[in-house]
Design a protein with these regions (language model features):
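Conserved nucleotide-binding/hydrolysis micro-motifs of P-loop NTPases
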Residues: 4-9, 31-38, 47-51, 96, ...
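Short, high-confidence coil segments that cap the C-terminus of an alpha-helix
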Residues: 84-86, 131-132, 151
Length: 221
């Protein structure tokens, strides 16, 4: 196997090297962008103002963040606002989130591990010709090296603090196409305790990778 993302944690990095061998070369995403291999990008962190809710664990908080109906309505509106600027890939953690988004937007496509591989590939292939297609996919599916270069907008819903997940997720959209050399990334996060901590960690990764990023607080009802 091959990977372009070596984990930051030593025990994970050692496991990776034991499985596929030593690192044979090291080029950062910024270097590949400067060489014209990868698309340029901007990351817009949208911090939804979810009030002062308190949860005793990250799992409880995350469940609320990705299934609360009013929050899903807001997320749906944000994604729809991007649709006229090109194909959009929305990455989510829970199947329940995808189902809720599809209830509101039946013309979108939802891809999860439950979908047959051939059906998944058919949807990916359609992006080659489509212009305003919206694909919702779980992080687990997207982690398996999908190749869909004509993604112009990438939405990350509560991606957490895993270096590999965050960087690999961005990698799904940063590939160039004949009519694409720029990617807009929307990092959807919250002002709640655990989400806020994870967002701070992601900002460190963005800074390390020299990815331009800004943060905007978003009020909603």
């Amino acid at each position: 196997g091959l990977t372009g993302t070596i984990p930051k944690d030593e025990y994970e990095a050692v496991g990776c090297i034991c499985s596929i061998g030593p690192v044979v070369g090291n080029l950062s995403s910024k270097e590949l962008q400067d060489m014209g291999v990868l698309a340029d990008l901007d990351i817009n962190i949208l911090q939804l103002q979810d009030g002062v809710l308190g949860f005793s664990s990250y799992a409880q908080e995350l469940k609320w963040l990705v299934t609360d109906p009013k929050r899903i309505d807001q997320i749906s509106n944000i994604v729809k606002g991007l649709s006229n600027s090109g194909n959009t890939l929305v990455l989510i953690d829970r199947i329940a989130t995808g189902e809720m988004l599809m209830e509101r937007n039946p013309d979108w496509v939802f891809i999860s591990g439950e979908m047959k591989t051939t059906d998944r590939q058919k949807e990916y292939d359609e992006v080659s010709d489509a212009n305003n297609k919206i694909i919702v996919a779980t992080y687990g599916v997207a982690a398996v090296g999908i190749n869909i270069p004509r993604i112009f907008n990438l939405v990350l819903l509560e991606p957490g603090k895993s270096f590999v997940r965050v960087i690999q997720s961005i990698g799904r959209g940063i590939r160039k196409a004949s009519d694409k050399d720029y990617l807009q990334v929307i990092d959807l996060t919250s002002n709640l305790k655990y989400s806020k901590r994870h967002m701070s960690k992601r900002k460190e990764y963005y800074k390390e990778q020299n990815f331009r990023h800004t943060m905007t607080k978003v009020e909603y009802k």
